[in-house]
Each structure stands twice: as structure tokens, then as C-alpha cells.
Amino acid sequence: MDYTLVIDQGNTSSKVTVFENDKVVETLRFGVLSVEELCPIFEKYELRGVIYSSVAKLDVRLVESLRYMTEAPVLVMTHETSLPIKVVYKTPHTLGLDRVAAAVAAVSLYPQEAVLVVDAGTALTIDVVDGESQFVGGNISPGLAMRFKSLNEFTGALPLVEYSVSDATPIFGYDTTTAIRSGVINGIVAEITSSFEKASEAYNCKRIVLTGGDSEYLVSKMSDSKMMIDRHQDLVAKGLNRILRYNENN
């Protein structure tokens, strides 16, 4: 079997994904990733390659352990890693590796098509990939949970409001809780919508590709939109897997 292992260390958790060619066969999430938790994967699968990526500080000890545990080559994703897309960002050394990976996956899924890539995680990133497979740039703002939390932490009286798919989000809240919820949710939807409209004008973008922990929630709040929205929960992992295979062949 042709298995590859993708390790994506995010801001608040780590995601481990096993691929058979381009198909996801197993996904695991960890709060804090340790080598011991990866042992069952190495025992279960005969891997042909591993890729490790972190948006935070590189875990050198983990990388060393990975190389000790498997004979498969381990690719550590950096800003110097060869990519199947062109990055025209002015400061590529500061560009989040997760944003790069999501863009790579979007190009693979929608070749020669300009798309808006939205990753709704701890932070909300909204990036443009043009029809020539170029990462053009994008925006970074607080994610949903961070917005709710900041209103609670940086004010004297506003409560911490929870959110779920079933919650109503009126245009204008009728009490403090709904005012906060509607302000945050409608605000973030308006932010995405405005970015899409601008990307459509500038790059003929016709599709939003949505991923991240809050992507399912946001899709439910944008269901009445006329925009074409595709949700891919494993977008970053798919991009990292594509980068791994690209480097195997180059």
C-alpha cells in the first residue's frame, strides 16, 4: 500500500492524517502531540513518506524521534520547501505554512480556477489563489472563539457567549447575548462576503473553499448565500500531502 503520514501542528492542537495516495484513511487529533501517540500509526502502516509542519515553533525533538521511528523519509515543511504553486507574497518567510498548504490543496482541487481560501480556526485567514496557481495574498483576523473571548476579557460586563449551529443570529440582537452573537457571527460572515466580492472583481474568483474547526458552523450561517461554497475539512492536510508527493518527484 502507498501510505503517507501528514503531521500538522496548529495553534491549539495537532492533526495527524494518514493518506493512501490522495485518500484520507485515518485522522487523529491531539492537544499535545507526543511520540508515544504516534507509535500505533507506525505499527499499523508501512509508510513511504512523512511530512511535518508547524505554525508554531519547530519541535526538533519530535522530528528527531520521527526519523528514528521510521525508515521513510521525513520532510520538514519550511519556507524553503519546494511548492507546486507560485507564492507572490512580498514576505514569504512570514507566511503561515498552513496558509500555503491550504492554497496548494485548493489549486489541486480546482486547477486553473481563482478561489478564495478561508480557514476558520483560531485565526480567520482569507487568502486568494488566482487562476494561474499563484498565492496572491490575503487577510488575517481573529477567529470566532477569539472574538467572543476578547469581548468577555477586555470589557467589564460582557459575558462569554457560547455558539452552536442551532443558535439564531438575528440581524440585530434583542438582548446582550444575542447582540454579541449576532455581532460576531454576522460580522465574520460580512467579512468573508466582502473579501469574496473584491476577489471576484480583481481575480474573477467564483468559489469559496472553506476549512478549519469552525468551517461547518460558518457554512450553516452562510447557507442562504448565492456564493459557491465548498467545505473541505482536511484541506491543509491534503495540501501537505500534495507538497510531500511533489518533493518526492522533484
Label the model's feature ranges.
Residues 1-13, 17, 24-115, 132-250:
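Nucleotide/phosphate-binding catalytic cleft detector across ATP-hydrolyzing
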Residues 19, 127-130:
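Short beta-strand-to-turn element immediately C-terminal to the catalytic PLP-Schiff-base lysine
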